[in-house]
């Protein structure tokens, strides 16, 4: 979803041959997934959305992003520069993309899924009749990993978007080992959960919380 939102926002950049005029209603509907024009048709009416996942469903933070989307639409198209910007220099695409990477993806990863691991059940399969042989804890761990990357063999693959992409950038991987350390912690924790060792998994939760904070801070400083 965020990939298509970003593509739509960038269509208003002045560097394009024919910069588009953004429609605020379209951006807002993409955010809450009432939108039906997705290029990826699997996103249509799939019951998932970015808005409800933003900052643990904080209405104030959601309103902030919606305000940026309205402002981006009002400012479009940008015919004076390469990027869609406010008079103060704020680049709307970056504010929305990077903001949601933090308020949605990083938040869901750490403050939602990993934060609940200690109380998750790890003894009963979720729904064997439906082919869901994993436990609640295994499922939530995998959900957290999915907010980092969708590639099981990261960082061999899965370095093309969002946190999986930025963690593997030289300024993060070479300096603080973000891609390697986060990948290792996720794998180590998942193995511990499958082995029934919750205490060992919680050690990896602590490592991941620290590593994600460092990754976000390092990206912001860069």
Regions found by a protein language model. Name each.
Residues 1-222:
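Mature extracytoplasmic or organellar-lumen-exposed domains after removal of signal/transit peptides
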């Amino acid at each position: 979803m965020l990939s298509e939102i970003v593509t739509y926002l960038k269509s208003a950049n002045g560097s394009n041959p024919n910069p588009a005029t953004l429609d605020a209603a379209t951006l807002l509907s993409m955010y809450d997934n009432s939108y039906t024009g997705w290029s990826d048709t699997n996103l249509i009416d799939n019951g998932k959305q970015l808005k409800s996942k933003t900052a643990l469903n904080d209405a104030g933070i959601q309103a902030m992003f919606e305000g940026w989307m309205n402002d981006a639409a009002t400012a479009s198209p940008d015919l004076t520069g390469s990027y869609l910007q406010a008079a103060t220099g704020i680049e709307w695409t970056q504010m929305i993309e990077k903001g949601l990477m933090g308020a949605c993806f990083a938040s869901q990863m750490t403050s939602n899924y990993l934060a609940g691991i200690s109380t998750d059940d790890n003894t009963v399969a979720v729904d064997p009749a439906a082919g869901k042989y994993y436990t609640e804890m295994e499922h939530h761990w995998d959900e957290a990993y999915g907010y980092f990357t969708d590639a099981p063999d990261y960082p061999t693959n899965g370095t093309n978007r969002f946190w999986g992409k930025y963690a593997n950038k030289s300024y993060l991987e070479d300096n603080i080992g973000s891609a390697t350390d986060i990948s290792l912690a996720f794998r180590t924790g998942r193995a511990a959960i499958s082995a029934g060792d919750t205490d060992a998994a919680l050690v990896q939760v602590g490592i991941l919380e620290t590593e994600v904070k460092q990754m976000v801070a390092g990206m912001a400083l860069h």
